[in-house]
């Protein structure tokens, strides 16, 4: 009987001695329904301590391989340098969303007369600015914006326009100071490098204070000629939040032996 007891005691002492940060642990769900009624959901679990953050994809019906179950994002500097880690393949890769979307923007800019996508100057209205009750146990402030603009797609000079109305609700909190939260809980999308589209991303609605604990975006696009419209909906919500969690320091380390992969051209390397 002594051996099991001593083994349990040794394990307990090991756990107690392992370095840990006083940090934040949360769970979040993002649900998307497109104009055709197709839906997807991504559930994540996050650990944050100051500028350090780990965001693991727990469940996903999104077809992107980056969000497959078990894959996670890792940073030590609030997302300035971000890694996508794949435990199944034992690989890690620099995750630079701005660079990826910038490549898309370059393609949009380079299509010239073949394909041109234009966005009119957006009109932004603040339609709500009030107490938002509590979300995941945190006091929240609710703001709502209505943004209207026109998109025009031209192929070889022939164009079609749509009038777009985007209504976006934010429930934000300023009670959480940890910068690592911004890796996942962010209101402002990354830039694409396309001037017209990026103008939409710098509107007043993204100049909110604190971190969003819940966001709901409903976008309706209407063809002015036919009158037909389509609507998409996106909802992100933090469902659980512990602000005094013990977060193991090892949570923010890439495991030894993982090899570097490439999402975009980068220098080769590995962690032995």
Task: Go through each PLM region and give its residues.
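Extended soluble regions of mature proteins
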Residues: 21-272
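Bacterial N-terminal signal peptides that target proteins for export
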Residues: 1-9
């Amino acid at each position: 009987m002594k051996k099991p007891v001593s083994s349990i005691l040794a394990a307990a002492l090991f756990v107690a001695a392992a370095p840990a940060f006083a940090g934040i642990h949360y769970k979040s769900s993002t649900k998307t329904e497109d104009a055709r009624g197709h839906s997807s959901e991504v559930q994540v679990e996050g650990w944050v301590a100051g500028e350090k953050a780990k965001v693991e994809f727990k469940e996903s019906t999104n077809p992107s391989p980056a969000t497959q179950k078990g894959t996670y994002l890792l940073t030590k500097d609030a997302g300035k340098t971000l890694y996508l880690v794949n435990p199944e393949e034992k690989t890690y890769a620099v995750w630079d969303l701005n660079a990826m979307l910038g490549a898309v923007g370059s393609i949009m800019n380079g299509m010239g007369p073949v394909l041109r996508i234009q966005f009119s100057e957006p009109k932004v209205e603040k339609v709500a600015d009030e107490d938002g009750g509590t979300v995941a146990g945190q006091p929240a402030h609710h703001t709502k914006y209505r943004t209207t603009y026109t998109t025009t797609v031209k192929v070889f000079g022939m164009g079609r326009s749509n009038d777009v109305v985007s209504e976006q609700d934010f429930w934000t909190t300023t009670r959480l100071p940890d910068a690592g939260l911004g890796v996942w809980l962010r209101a402002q999308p990354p830039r694409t490098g396309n001037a017209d589209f990026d103008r939409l991303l710098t509107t007043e609605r993204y100049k909110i204070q604190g971190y969003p604990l819940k966001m709901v975006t409903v976008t309706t696009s209407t063809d002015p000629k036919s009158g037909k419209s389509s609507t998409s909906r996106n909802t992100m919500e933090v469902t659980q939040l512990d602000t005094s969690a013990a977060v193991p320091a090892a949570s923010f380390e890439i495991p030894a032996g993982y090899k570097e992969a490439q999402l975009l051209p980068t220098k080769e390397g590995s962690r032995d």
